[in-house]
C-alpha cells in the first residue's frame, strides 16, 4: 500500500520547508569610514564591507535562504531596484522585502546561522545579533542560533580578508 495515495490517511496540517542561504564580502581598507554591520549590529574598530549596500552578510544570507523557498530573488533584483531608484543600502529593508515574499500561510520558525571570519570578534556581540535577528524575523529569541568560527587561517575569511555566513531557515507552511 502506498501511503501517498491512501485517502483515508489524515492530511498533515503543516509541512516544513528548509531554506539555505549564503553570503560573503571582503573588508574595505582600515581607513574606510563605512561601518562593519552584522545582523544589524555595528562592530566598532572594524572596517565595513565592499558592497553596494551596507554589506550585512548575515541579513543577506537570511534573504537568500528565504529566496530559496519563495523563488523570489531579493538580492540582485529587489535590492538592486531599491538601491538604484531610492538609494536604499540598509540590508534590514532588503530583509523586510524578503519576509514579505513569504506566502500568507508560511512562517519562519527557526534560524540557524554560522559565521566564518578572523575578525571582528563575534562573541561579545552574539547576544545582540541574536536579538536583532529574532526581532527582524518576528520569532522567539530561542529560535535563533548562531555559531562563529575564526577559520584558523585556512581560507580568505580565516585570514581576515572578509566574512562569510551561511543560514538555514525552517519555514512552516500551513496546508490544512
Curated annotation (Swiss-Prot):
GO terms for molecular function: 2-C-methyl-D-erythritol 2,4-cyclodiphosphate synthase activity; metal ion binding. Pathway: Isoprenoid biosynthesis; isopentenyl diphosphate biosynthesis via DXP pathway; isopentenyl diphosphate from 1-deoxy-D-xylulose 5-phosphate: step 4/6. InterPro entries: MECDP_synthase, MECDP_synthase_CS, MECDP_synthase_sf. One of its GO terms (biological process) is isopentenyl diphosphate biosynthetic process, methylerythritol 4-phosphate pathway. A divalent metal cation binds at residues 23, 25, 60. The keyword Lyase applies. Its cofactor is a divalent metal cation. Involved in the biosynthesis of isopentenyl diphosphate (IPP) and dimethylallyl diphosphate (DMAPP), two major building blocks of isoprenoid compounds. Catalyzes the conversion of 4-diphosphocytidyl-2-C-methyl-D-erythritol 2-phosphate (CDP-ME2P) to 2-C-methyl-D-erythritol 2,4-cyclodiphosphate (ME-CPP) with a corresponding release of cytidine 5-monophosphate (CMP). This is 2-C-methyl-D-erythritol 2,4-cyclodiphosphate synthase. It comes from Chlamydia abortus (strain DSM 27085 / S26/3).
Amino acid at each position: 500500500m502506498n501511503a501517498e495515495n491512501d485517502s483515508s490517511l489524515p492530511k498533515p496540517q503543516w509541512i516544513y520547508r528548509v531554506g539555505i542561504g549564503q553570503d560573503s564580502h571582503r573588508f574595505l581598507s582600515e581607513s574606510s569610514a563605512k561601518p562593519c554591520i552584522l545582523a544589524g549590529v555595528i562592530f566598532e574598530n572594524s572596517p565595513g564591507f565592499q558592497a553596494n549596500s551596507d554589506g550585512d552578510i548575515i541579513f543577506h544570507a537570511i534573504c537568500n535562504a528565504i529566496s530559496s523557498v519563495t523563488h523570489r530573488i531579493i538580492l540582485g533584483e529587489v535590492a538592486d531596484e531599491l538601491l538604484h531608484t531610492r538609494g536604499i543600502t540598509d540590508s534590514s529593508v532588503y530583509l523586510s522585502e524578503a519576509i514579505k515574499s513569504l506566502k500568507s500561510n508560511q512562517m519562519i520558525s527557526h534560524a540557524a546561522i554560522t559565521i566564518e571570519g578572523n575578525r571582528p570578534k563575534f562573541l561579545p556581540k552574539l547576544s545582540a545579533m541574536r536579538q536583532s535577528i529574532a526581532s527582524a524575523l518576528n520569532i522567539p529569541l530561542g529560535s535563533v542560533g548562531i555559531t562563529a568560527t575564526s577559520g584558523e587561517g585556512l581560507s580568505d575569511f580565516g585570514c581576515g580578508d572578509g566574512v562569510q555566513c551561511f543560514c538555514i531557515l525552517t519555514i512552516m507552511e500551513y496546508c490544512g
